[in-house]
């Protein structure tokens, strides 16, 4: 797919294809880019994506694209980022302070720093290898999926807007949800709790 001459493009949806490469360096007007699901079993995958020139991007969907790395440090306008089901060695979202939605699950992440992402409302970081997660700066969070990691503690006392919290399949021994009075869904199964206070 050659879109190098289509410099006026603002929206590009290539989801559910078999792309092995995509050059969007000339498409600086892009605000929406969807590359969901480029993986076909046994086939070559996309592996890399250069969006450093695409500073107008507000929406980037590249889940299950086969990426081994993703640099979004130049994409400061991003409000939506979904990069789950990739084999990323790491994810740096420290420059993406406008993010309200972040999905980076199933990505073999061992750490995730969201301290700069104070506008975050939804965070999906489940099924990684996280041993800690600090969401104390994310006071706008309404949805948190951090299940199936290796968390031994989780502090959600600052997240008073939380309505959905899934933290099962971790190694938690305690969890204080006394400040989370808006919670409607709470998943705690398969942890190491001996007592749970939901008073």
PLM-predicted stretches and their roles:
Residues 6-8, 27-31, 43, 54-58, ...:
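Leucine-rich repeat
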Residues 24-38:
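A broadly tuned "polar low-complexity/structure-edge" signature
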Residues 8, 13-18, 34-46, 56-67, ...:
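Concave beta-strand-loop units of leucine-rich repeat
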Residues 123, 134, 138, 155-159, ...:
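Intrinsically disordered, low-complexity Ser/Thr- and Pro-rich stretches
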Residues 1, 22, 46-51, 70, ...:
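Canonical leucine-rich repeat
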């Amino acid at each position: 797919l050659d879109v190098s001459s289509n410099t006026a493009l603002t929206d590009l949806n290539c989801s559910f294809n078999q792309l092995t490469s995509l050059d969007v360096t000339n498409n600086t007007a892009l605000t929406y880019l969807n590359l969901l699901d480029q993986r076909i079993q046994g086939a070559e995958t996309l592996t890399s994506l250069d969006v450093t020139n695409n500073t107008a991007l507000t929406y980037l969907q590249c889940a299950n694209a086969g990426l081994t790395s993703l640099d979004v440090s130049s994409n400061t306008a991003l409000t939506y980022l979904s990069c789950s089901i990739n084999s990323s060695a790491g994810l740096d979202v420290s420059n993406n302070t406008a993010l309200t939605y972040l999905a980076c699950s199933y990505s073999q992440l061992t750490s995730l720093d969201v301290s700069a992402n104070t506008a975050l409302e939804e965070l999906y970081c489940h099924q990684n290898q996280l041993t800690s997660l600090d969401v104390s700066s994310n006071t706008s969070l309404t949805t948190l999926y951090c299940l199936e990691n290796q968390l031994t503690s989780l502090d959600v006392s600052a997240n008073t807007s939380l309505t959905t919290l899934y933290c099962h399949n971790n190694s938690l021994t305690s969890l204080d949800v006394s400040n989370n009075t808006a919670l409607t869904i709470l998943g705690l199964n398969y942890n190491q709790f001996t007592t749970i206070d939901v008073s």
